[in-house]
Amino acid sequence: MGIKGLTGLLSENAPKCMKDHEMKTLFGRKVAIDASMSIYQFLIAVRQQDGQMLMNESGDVTSHLMGFFYRTIRMVDHGIKPCYIFDGKPPELKGSVLAKRFARREEAKEGEEEAKETGTAEDVDKLARRQVRVTREHNEECKKLLSLMGIPVVTAPGEAEAQCAELARAGKVYAAGSEDMDTLTFNSPILLRHLTFSEAKKMPISEIHLDVALRDLEMSMDQFIELCILLGCDYLEPCKGIGPKTALKLMREHGTLGKVVEHIRGKMAEKAEEIKAAADEEAEAEAEAEKYDSDPESEEGGETMINSDGEEVPAPSKLKSPKKKAPAKKKKVASSGMQIPEFWPWEEAKQLFMKPDVVNGDDLVLEWKQPDTEGLVEFLCRDKGFNEDRVRAGAAKLSKMLAAKQQGRLDGFFTVKPKEPAAKDTGKGKGKATKGEKRKAEEKGSAKKKSKN
């Protein structure tokens, strides 16, 4: 999920931090890519025409391998040096989110069975994609493939995005590559999105600079992390009634998430009192109305009357007309508004962003090697049923690009200096000389010197 609504918030409030460009502009760059996100993306996107995942004759899924092989070659072909970071053990705080994802997959599975009988092919395909789950086998197969391709692979002790951010901060790579916006929350200086998208989508690479975002939002990194938590992250239950605009407004008004939480909990208490008072008033009104809702009473009269036969008979009882029930007036109560879950350990979530479980970037060595062509043919063609000619052609392209000495980037040789502001002229009136007057004075001075000589 990443951070809910962060992309829109930045595009609206800090647009200068985001820029789109073609992949070829990243030539010569090293990028740490969130492999776990990429596997999930490939399993969903790389499919047959009927919407089913790619499989070999044995029924083994190969969508993830197809995606990694060809899209990595595409990046290398544009002069990019990718390395892939895989997830380790998720933090305990993420357990509830993972449990909900599992529940959603089960719901989608049940829905798919029903859609097969009553729904359209589009409904079935949509529900099938919601059931995608990355397994340990998927991870191991991708690691094996990338190693055979000569691409560096790192297994993070914790979150892959956090390790990508660490490598970017350490200067081992230019940027972190992921679709999850929480990569910025993990303090990655630069985030690249859409790197592993299909070329057919024609999606430009989105480059986001954290320092520019912080500058334009007028926030410290500490405040930015707290803003992201308030927006909604993978570690906590989302807060109801708080969208991106409200979250930013609250952080700007109160300064810290602690004060925001205190403010919202105060509002929640006021709302609870208001609802209770309205309920008490309604109950009182209903009790009052019950007095008018009793059975009609009869009046026994002692009078008599003469009937048509001239006989004296008792007069009928006089009935009281029933009184109408007084309608109970209901007090209007405003909607519940902003709500924070009762158990919402945001301080723990903040620590996971500030001090994630990662390997120090300086301790990691990233090495790009020549691909093992025969190993690729054995694994992809013999085991997984890939076309051998295509695999050999891809390996040859990979070998050529990794062996070639990459052209240096111009921005590596030159430093662009900011333009110095023009000196302010404080001269006034006659004392202020123009450029033309200065030049004439200099010419006169030089003429006098020549005449003396």
Swiss-Prot record:
Cofactor note: Binds 2 magnesium ions per subunit. They probably participate in the reaction catalyzed by the enzyme. May bind an additional third magnesium ion after substrate binding.
Post-translational modification: Phosphorylated. Phosphorylation upon DNA damage induces relocalization to the nuclear plasma.
Compositionally biased intervals (Basic and acidic residues): 417-446
Cofactor(s) the record lists: Mg(2+)
E.C. code: 3.1.-.-
Region (Disordered) residue spans: 273-336, 409-453
Record-given protein name: Flap endonuclease 1
Species, as recorded: Cryptococcus neoformans var. neoformans serotype D (strain JEC21 / ATCC MYA-565) (Filobasidiella neoformans)
